Amino acid sequence: MAAVPRGLLSRINQFLSIRSITPSSSESLPHCSSFFLIRRFSSDTGLMDGGGSDIIGAQTRIIEAKQGEMSSRSKRTGIIAVKCGMTALWDKWGKRIPISILWVDDNIVSQVKTVEKEGIFALQIGCGQKKPKHLSKAVVGHFRAQGVPLKRKLREFPVTEDALLPVGTSLGVRHFVPGQYVDVTGITRGKGFQGCMKRHGFSGMPASHGASLSHRSGGSTGQRDAPGKVFKGRKMAGRMGADQRTVKNVWVYKIDPARNLMWVRGQVPGAEGNFVFIKDAWCKKPDISKLPFPTYLAPEDEDPSELEPLVADLGEVDPFMLAE
């Protein structure tokens, strides 16, 4: 019999708990002093035995959309946005700020994942709209099973247990607050097949003094008979761009709840119209007392079209004035 990998055993023990139960009658249990019962979770998170009968009543996790208190260990979900382009703005002190405009297009919670069923606390977020004819039957069935509209883009964000939201919860631009830092992930622009000088920043070969037809060459790629090969990972010419990259510590300058727009400082990966994924910054953590947790839940009488844009606090000290 082949040995079972230790990693596989630890993974199985994470989801399955083996309990020893003493039989009470010979009719319901086998004729032995004890037998092992394997814990298996059904679709309604109830505890089932091997035959499918209920051993313990259904243990349904109740997830409510209500404001809570965020702790230092809490992790909120992220959102999906569309990159609209770049521009420049001037703040109240006259300082020019390069700006990327992001559009949060109808984000909604499309699935909730818990430790009992999937082994992780996470929220699946959907963005945009799409027609059924442009989606596969499996994806359409997934949305209909969850009871949410068809979405154009899906993304899963790991969260903590206290940051779970029920399916159907809407997420808007007020999930973030002006002045905080976020991490933005996206697919960079594809630049096709490029040489070493553009792709890796090589200086190239000499421009004169006998050099011919090798001015932009990458130079030597290996050694002699030993090792007699080119090592993996050697920087050479090849396809450049179209990779997933994350820009960290992006400052949120302004948000517009009426149009679900977000102005962030600097550039973000991707071209205009590409999807980007925004979440709270990992390095420059925001002030948890100012963040809506687990998200911003608008009052019933609030009209988003009448809300004014919110701008980050720039302080009362003019940065252009010399210190006295």
Swiss-Prot record:
<dbReference type="GO" id="GO:0005739">
    <property type="term" value="C:mitochondrion"/>
</dbReference>
<keyword id="KW-0496">Mitochondrion</keyword>
<comment type="function">
    <text>One of the primary rRNA binding proteins, it binds directly near the 3'-end of the 23S rRNA, where it nucleates assembly of the 50S subunit.</text>
</comment>
<dbReference type="GO" id="GO:1990904">
    <property type="term" value="C:ribonucleoprotein complex"/>
</dbReference>
<comment type="similarity">
    <text>Belongs to the universal ribosomal protein uL3 family.</text>
</comment>
<dbReference type="InterPro" id="IPR019926">
    <property type="entry name" value="Ribosomal_uL3_CS"/>
</dbReference>
<dbReference type="Pfam" id="PF00297">
    <property type="entry name" value="Ribosomal_L3"/>
</dbReference>
<feature type="transit peptide" description="Mitochondrion">
    <location>
        <begin position="1"/>
        <end position="41"/>
    </location>
</feature>
<dbReference type="GO" id="GO:0003735">
    <property type="term" value="F:structural constituent of ribosome"/>
</dbReference>
<dbReference type="GO" id="GO:0006412">
    <property type="term" value="P:translation"/>
</dbReference>
<keyword id="KW-0694">RNA-binding</keyword>
<dbReference type="GO" id="GO:0005840">
    <property type="term" value="C:ribosome"/>
</dbReference>
<feature type="region of interest" description="Disordered">
    <location>
        <begin position="206"/>
        <end position="229"/>
    </location>
</feature>
<comment type="subunit">
    <text>Part of the 50S ribosomal subunit.</text>
</comment>
<dbReference type="InterPro" id="IPR009000">
    <property type="entry name" value="Transl_B-barrel_sf"/>
</dbReference>
<keyword id="KW-0809">Transit peptide</keyword>
<dbReference type="InterPro" id="IPR000597">
    <property type="entry name" value="Ribosomal_uL3"/>
</dbReference>
<keyword id="KW-0689">Ribosomal protein</keyword>
<protein>
    <recommendedName>
        <fullName>Large ribosomal subunit protein uL3m</fullName>
    </recommendedName>
</protein>
<dbReference type="GO" id="GO:0003729">
    <property type="term" value="F:mRNA binding"/>
</dbReference>
<dbReference type="GO" id="GO:0019843">
    <property type="term" value="F:rRNA binding"/>
</dbReference>
<dbReference type="InterPro" id="IPR019927">
    <property type="entry name" value="Ribosomal_uL3_bac/org-type"/>
</dbReference>
<keyword id="KW-0687">Ribonucleoprotein</keyword>
<keyword id="KW-0699">rRNA-binding</keyword>
